[in-house]
Amino acid sequence: WIMGHMVNAIAQIDEFVNLGANSIETDVSFDKNANPEYTYHGIPCDCGRTCTKWEYFNTFLGGLRKATTPGDSKYHEKLVLVVFDLKTGSLYDNQAYDAGTKLAKSLLQNYWNKGNNGGRAYIVLSIPNLDHYKLITGFKETLTKEEHPELMDKVGYDFSGNDDIGDVAKAYKKAGVTGHVWQSDGITNCLLRGLDRVRKAVANRDSSNGYINKVYYWTVDKRASTRDALDAGVDGIMTNYPDVIADVLGESAYTAKFRIATYDDNPWETFKN
């Protein structure tokens, strides 16, 4: 999965997919009542990027729905996965459940079109704080209450705080999550980060009793760091330059081992060689 980083304006969906992304990451900020409000990152952000592009969250979902609904004039067949980077740092811990509830209602209405030919992309809810695991509970219980529990088949999870892998496992246990787990690792492109924790996550993914299904690394903009991440065995790379990742995947060292994921590749299944 080539994951376009910080895609917060509707116009950027086309831009990143046209550069080679089959997945995008979108920031979601919340108001003080835990309503998802804007797709917005803000300053500071990655080096070389404009930090302040934004839409209202529900407006963005409408654009995203069009981009992922077959038959729509804006449809992109290859856009198959969306990571919502949920900026829950502005919320109190006890608001996490409410945030999950409100997020589910927004997606149900504006993205899934109440289950009636809505967008088809797989969705990852990426949460920065392990203490906010109840966001997952709120999300799940709301879709059940709204009589669309089947949509949870399209939803996965990530805790994005670079926490100890064992602590992440405990948070999933509390949330009752037993699958659909993506594990992120990374840092802003302005700084360097080694691959030690990525290797631990990959080892967990590949062990018989691990909780991780997929591992992605962020934010990778250079060919050398792309090769290092691929050599470590990641499933996804988040980038500001999808064309760079696509180029490296085309190198002879990688064409036999990797290919770009399509809609038929289940993002919740651990890849077995």
Curated annotation (Swiss-Prot):
Mg(2+) binds at residues 25, 27, 85. It comes from the Eukaryota. InterPro entries: PLC-like_Pdiesterase_TIM-brl. Binds 1 Mg(2+) ion per subunit. The keyword Secreted applies. Expressed by the venom gland. It is found in: Secreted. The active site is at residues 5, 41. Its cofactor is Mg(2+). Keywords: Cytolysis, Dermonecrotic toxin, Disulfide bond, Hemolysis, Lipid degradation, Lipid metabolism, Lyase, Magnesium, Metal-binding, Secreted, Toxin. Disulfide bonds join 45-51, 47-190. One of its GO terms (cellular component) is extracellular region. SUPFAM superfamilies: PLC-like phosphodiesterases. Its EC number is 4.6.1.-. Its main location: secreted. It is an enzyme of class 4 (lyase). Dermonecrotic toxins cleave the phosphodiester linkage between the phosphate and headgroup of certain phospholipids (sphingolipid and lysolipid substrates), forming an alcohol (often choline) and a cyclic phosphate. This toxin acts on sphingomyelin (SM). It may also act on ceramide phosphoethanolamine (CPE), lysophosphatidylcholine (LPC) and lysophosphatidylethanolamine (LPE), but not on lysophosphatidylserine (LPS), and lysophosphatidylglycerol (LPG). It acts by transphosphatidylation, releasing exclusively cyclic phosphate products as second products. Belongs to the arthropod phospholipase D family. Class II subfamily. This is Dermonecrotic toxin LsaSicTox-alphaIB1avi.
